[in-house]
Regions:
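Alpha-helical transmembrane segments and membrane-interface helix-loop junctions
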Residues: 2-185
Length: 185
């Protein structure tokens, strides 16, 4: 009788797959320092409000904008670093060849979904950036600060989704090349 070894799940790929992934990871690491800036400006707000009884009008919206922007970028970072969510119950239980086909399905479905989201986000960003007559007019928050953060976030969502579509295309090409190379052997 042969002794069976328990199946060990695959380790996530630690290396970016292409130049775009490398750039996203590098830029994301730099932008992650903005989380610290958010902590500092939030601390500033607490000090001003509770020690000097002089609350700010800009900290809450600015901190929310920075945090929201970083979370949007976090989506393309997770995909670039291969840290996205997958159903490991199925993925880890199948052979490496089957994983390649699951990756192919994942990239096809993801490409379709990201493309539809990018298309939808375009109309939201366009409405947030331009008046109905075509003049540039950024949507603002409507608060005392009245910053153009809503328009900037909608534009960032559109850009991030366009990048995600490109990522899916590049990853799909790599998956197809990997299948072709395996089938040729």
């Amino acid at each position: 009788m042969t002794e069976q070894t328990p199946h060990t799940p695959p380790e996530p790929d630690e290396h970016p797959r292409n130049v775009l992934d490398r750039a996203i990871i590098k830029v994301s690491h730099l932008l992650s320092w903005l989380f610290i800036a958010t902590v500092f400006i939030s601390f500033y707000e607490v000090v001003m409000r509770y020690l000097f009884d002089s609350p700010t009008t800009w900290v809450h919206e600015t901190a929310s904008f920075i945090g929201g922007s970083l979370f949007i970028i976090g989506g393309i970072y997770a995909f670039a670093a291969n840290r996205h969510v997958r159903v490991v119950l199925i993925y880890d239980a199948v052979s490496s060849q089957t994983r390649k086909y699951l990756n192919l399905v994942h990239h096809l479905v993801g490409l379709a979904f990201a493309s539809m989201l990018a298309y939808s986000s375009y109309s939201l960003a366009k409405e947030a950036w331009f008046a109905p007559w075509g003049e540039l007019r950024l949507e603002t928050s409507g608060s005392v600060l009245n910053a153009p953060y809503p328009a900037l976030l909608k534009g960032l969502i559109f850009i991030a989704l366009c990048i995600l579509v490109i990522q899916f295309v590049l990853h799909l090409i790599q998956e197809l090349m990997g299948l072709r190379n395996k089938d040729d052997v």
